[in-house]
A protein has these predicted regions:
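N-terminal beta1-alpha1 cap of cysteine-dependent amidohydrolase-like domains
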Residues: 1-105, 117, 127-155, 171-177, ...
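Short, surface-exposed beta-strand/loop micro-motifs that present aromatic residues
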Residues: 187-193
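Active-site loop->helix "elbow" adjoining a glycine-rich segment at hydrolase catalytic centers
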Residues: 109-111, 118
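Post-Walker A helix-loop "phosphate-sensing" segment adjacent to the P-loop in P-loop NTPases
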Residues: 119-123
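Short catalytic/ligand-gating loop segments at beta-alpha or beta-beta junctions
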Residues: 159-167, 191
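Beta-strand-turn-beta hairpins that frame and shape the catalytic cleft
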Residues: 176, 193-196
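Active-site glycine-centered loops adjacent to acidic/histidine catalytic or metal-binding residues
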Residues: 108, 166, 202
Length: 221
């Protein structure tokens, strides 16, 4: 099984000069390689059609960059940093994979990008949704799982405890998507439309192999 994975971009400093680098967090690599998945990084918009042809699914990883509000018709909050625009790369990947009906999984920033790509909007800043420590056992709040959703198949439960590492969230849901999870304070934390799935938390940090295994079995086989 082959899964394309969005590599993220960040700045780093060398000799007082800012440089860009692309990276993948090891959490994703550890979880998915254990399940026999070959990960193919998407590093640019060039030759993306070949990656789509070769791969069985797309994973949109979490990342450090906020989505420019222009993409969902709002003015930027002056208190929020908008440094690197990754949206065109992600949008092209989502457009190409969805066009050929291959499954897509969006995590954290990935769920937000999916929502905006398909016509939704975001809250630019929300309080109390960011844990300071990243461990497999750290959770922050409960989410309610909607019955008959993919997530309910995964967890066989009406609620679960999840971690939280975000300060933006879905506001207006994209047309034709359904909500699959809602946080205890009322924010959308899971969405789905057919074989397009998004979650706001980080199952890879929680080492939730069952989540990824269910996605693979449900949509990639």
């Amino acid at each position: 099984m082959k899964m394309a994975i969005i590599a993220r971009t960040r700045y780093y400093e060398i000799n007082n000069n800012l440089k860009k680098e692309m990276f993948l967090k090891n959490y994703y690599i550890e979880c998915l390689t254990k399940l026999g998945v070959l990960l193919i990084p998407i590093l640019s918009e060039n030759n993306m059609e070949q990656i789509v042809d070769y791969c069985d699914a797309l994973l949109i990883t979490g990342g450090p960059n906020n989505i420019y509000p222009d993409y969902y018709g709002e003015q930027p909050d002056p208190n929020i940093e908008y440094k690197i625009d990754e949206f065109p790369l992600v949008k092209k990947a989502v457009t190409l994979f969805s066009k050929v009906k291959k499954p897509i999984l969006g995590i954290c920033a990935g769920i937000q990008e999916l929502n905006v790509i398909f016509g939704g909007t975001l809250y630019q800043n929300i309080p109390n949704h960011y844990l300071t420590q990243k461990t497999s056992t750290n959770t922050m709040h409960t989410v309610r799982i909607e019955k008959k959703s993919f997530l309910h198949k995964v967890y066989q439960s009406d609620s679960i405890n999840v971690n939280s590492y975000h300060h933006q969230a879905i506001k207006d849901l994209a047309p034709n998507f359904s909500v699959s999870a809602i946080s205890s304070d009322g924010y959308i934390e899971g969405i789905e439309k057919g074989n397009i799935i998004g979650v706001q938390w980080h199952p890879e940090i929680m080492k939730d192999l069952n989540f990824f295994k269910k996605f693979i079995n449900e949509y990639m086989k």
